Amino acid sequence: MSALKDVDQLTEAEARAEHARLAREIAGHDKAYYQSDAPKISDAAYDALRRKLEAIEVRFPQFIDLLSPTQRVGAVPSGKFGEIRHAVPMLSLGNAFNDEDVADFVGRIRRFLGLAESDVVAVTAEPKIDGLSASLRYVGGKLVHGATRGDGQTGEDVTQNLLTLDDIPDTLPPGDWPDVVEVRGEVYMSHADFAALNERQIEAGKDAYKNPRNAAAGSLRQIDPKMTSQRPLRFFAYAWGEVSEPLSDTQMGAVARFGEMGFPVNDLMARCETVEALLAVYRDIEARRAGLGYDIDGVVYKADRLDWQERLGFVARAPRWAIAHKFPAEQATTILEAIDIQVGRTGALTPVARLTPVTVGGVVVTNATLHNQDEIERKDIRVGDTVVIQRAGDVIPQVVRVVDPDRPGRGEAFDFPTECPVCGSQALREHDAKTGKLDVVRRCTGGLICGAQLKERLKHFVSRKAFDIEGLGIKQIEAFQEEGLITEPAHIFTLKARNEAGEIKPPLQEREGFGETSIRNLFTSIEDRRTITLARFLNALGIRHVGENTSALFARTYGSWAAFHAAAANLSDEAVRAEMLGIDGIGNAAVEALEQYFTEAHNRDLLDRLVAQLTIEDAEAIANDSPVAGKTVVFTGALERMTRDEAKAKAQALGAKVAGSVSGKTDYLVAGPGAGSKAKKAAELGVETLTEDEWFDLIGA
């Protein structure tokens, strides 16, 4: 019945059922289209299904999950095209949202490189094009392949489609170019071309695209390159991946060479030597935004000197030498009708505002996040208030402020619950012993006895970036968990044995929605996932503060589950803790979360049962023959040739583990002038001590 109702007429229970039905149906059509090239319905009918699913998720954001079809677009390669592994990963950028963030970015560069305040830090500024990232690999001047960004490590092979763009040459003009050069940039569609395309779509009885970015992405990813050739796509070059020799000494110089190669480059790009100059360029580009003729959503800043970029390196998900300064979000005014509390997989109680529907940036918004208890109290948000909401890009809308907080007849202040609305356990705000402050998030203390936490953790466990078990989606996880068939991850891998032993009644293959074939396929998918990489396994555990990037750092550092487990289970040991905190990109929050997780006996038991079902692959060995790969290094004293942060990042890039204190596990102590107690302890323990010059001789720098 819910399938016949408009989304705004659905109850939450009806919406949940309809969401599950749509997700299942769309997944089936995706498989038919992308894997079998045999679509069962028209594009218009498919788009209608997706539009309804998206509308439900706008109204009920608690249904949004990594498993939802709406969350899979633009991530891992779809299977529609061949895959290309990027020689150099295509990473994302960190964000700046105000002037202070930009000043902090420049300050971080200065501190990392050990520059004086009087030293000039030159930074480029250029428009952030709102399109689809692509990487073009040229060998001997010939385009050999082109790929989308994908998940940053692997993209889709869209070479033939990219060759249809007039802005992309199949052969570079004569010139002194590197033999191998990967040109990276953005595929986009101008406003005028977008309007003309939508007119043609409507005339042909097809749905119009929502915005130029979606149109560009959809056009580039057509199965038939002839279809792409009929779409007015453009390209701006602004970055590079693998190159066999340097393009230039500077960012500005490298981009200028792209222009010489025949690629369009953005003429608004500028080089600045002060924060004030950067902000002036930002405001100038923002003022020109409406008249540019194409979509931009901010300004990108990059350290101009390429030797500085190399020294600055990367953190887990982004370069230290670049940042995106986003434009302010679009805003609108509406009525806050109710405040609901959602419980996430880590027990966080998140308040959600239910709003009178309002259009913001072309999207109808009915829900917005209120973040936490402190935010509600600070902004004095109450049910019935007229509020300003804002939406930036694909970020969940948020309530900015109350329009008239002094109006007569306002409702009562919101009473934030101190008990979990799902399981009734106490919901507490943890006390941070170091800051002396309460955590801003109130969390359910029920752990896995809380149905909401258990369900969300199980859904995370099988999600795309974790175990990625095909056929075990939202509906199945919810049904199996509610029935008690799967109440911990290990139960997934015993499901087949229990079903065959007659412990599950009625048997799964005899249940509505299942059959012999679907159950056989499900069991095959589960068996295929018994072997998993260490990084995916750690991410799948859903430990607070240990997400995808942190898991990858741990995997790269420790190499094996045995080594990681030995460290995580012994964080009360100061040397073990110091070694983990010495990993570039790992902070106190992740270490404390791990210590708390491994302290709990039921978590250790759960892990033992799970690991017994799996083969956890060791992380790939670091691809170099560095003499310090796998060694533990400690730096002390005043280094003269580079800063401490820079030395640490360099050592880790060579495969070394950097610790903060000397122990029996330390292989080298690199001691600069002023080395004190660490040098003494190293001598007592027989740890080899190197001068800074000896260290550079060792690593060949």
Swiss-Prot record:
It catalyses: NAD(+) + (deoxyribonucleotide)n-3'-hydroxyl + 5'-phospho-(deoxyribonucleotide)m = (deoxyribonucleotide)n+m + AMP + beta-nicotinamide D-nucleotide. NAD(+) binds at D43, A44, A45, Y46, D47, S92, L93, E126, R149, E186, K302, K326. Zn(2+) binds at C420, C423, C444, C450. Residues 623-701 form the BRCT domain. InterPro entries: BRCT_dom, BRCT_dom_sf, DisA/LigA_HHH, DNA_ligase, DNA_ligase_AS, DNA_ligase_CS, DNAligase_adenylation, DNAligase_N. Its EC number is 6.5.1.2. This is DNA ligase. One of its GO terms (molecular function) is metal ion binding. It comes from the Bacteria. One of its GO terms (biological process) is DNA repair. SUPFAM superfamilies: BRCT domain (SSF52113), DNA ligase/mRNA capping enzyme, catalytic domain (SSF56091), Nucleic acid-binding proteins (SSF50249), RuvA domain 2-like (SSF47781). It comes from Maricaulis maris (strain MCS10) (Caulobacter maris).
